[in-house]
Amino acid sequence: MRGNEEKMNYENLYQTLQPQEKSVKDGLSSLQKLFKAVLRETESGDIKSLSRDIGSMADAALALSSALEEMKDSLGSFDTKAYFESGDFAAQMLAACEEKGVDVRGDFPVYEMFPYRVRLDTENQDVYLDRKKVQCMRPQSLVSTVQTGQEKLNKASFNALTFASELADAYELAVLKLKKNPGADLYLTSLYKFLAPMSRFRKDYDQQSFAFDLARLYISGINETKNGKKLQFGPSRNSNKCIRILDADGKEVFLATIRFYQDPASEI
């Protein structure tokens, strides 16, 4: 981090580019109108007007070129590498999260905005949203993208009972493969591998997606499968085995294990 030097902020560049973009837009509009006039004058044989408007087009083209050069100079003066390496981008991203109410945790350069994982690549000035590279130098825009994605996920249809039953099936397979006793606590991270056994499946259904589904199951309050087996989440002292989710109130909850068991009362 720099000492007393002025902090970089994309919003300052954005404000600088706004009037320059307007100049470019106006220049393009002027050229388009003049070109239409030139086409009409060429067809009608109006040489005097044609000569005048071609001259006007040349002047408009020079003005447009000048406006584009100003934009290039503004962009050239913005050191993207320093913006990332100084921590200014990260600090403004965190501020945008607070402003927009997006939950975030982690430390530079890796953050979690549940259920997304955000990584800042300072060497190449790239942002990764999970595995996807996002070309974004504006913290506010990045956080808005995350927020939109979260809203889309939350609106997507989800059958908690069906998911619970799928988990139960994977659990039974895991109990057999791992030679555990029925009803034993199994780590969710281990169960995930049975739910998505092949690597190509994990690309489409990664652990962040798994965590999001766990959160929706947790929030649903469902604690029994279709065939009557009870399910119970559990904690762990091993933080590496915990999966962080957010509850209905946006508070973080750490889940580590799960077990499915037959309620003795139901067997009577």
Give residue ranges: language-model regions.
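Short amphipathic alpha-helical interaction segments
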Residues: R202-G221
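Long, compositionally biased intrinsically disordered regions
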Residues: M1-S157
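Non-catalytic, well-ordered alpha-helical scaffold segments
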Residues: F114, D121-E123, L161, S165, ...
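C-terminal engagement modules used by replication, chromatin/transcription, nuclear envelope/ESCRT
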Residues: R216-I268
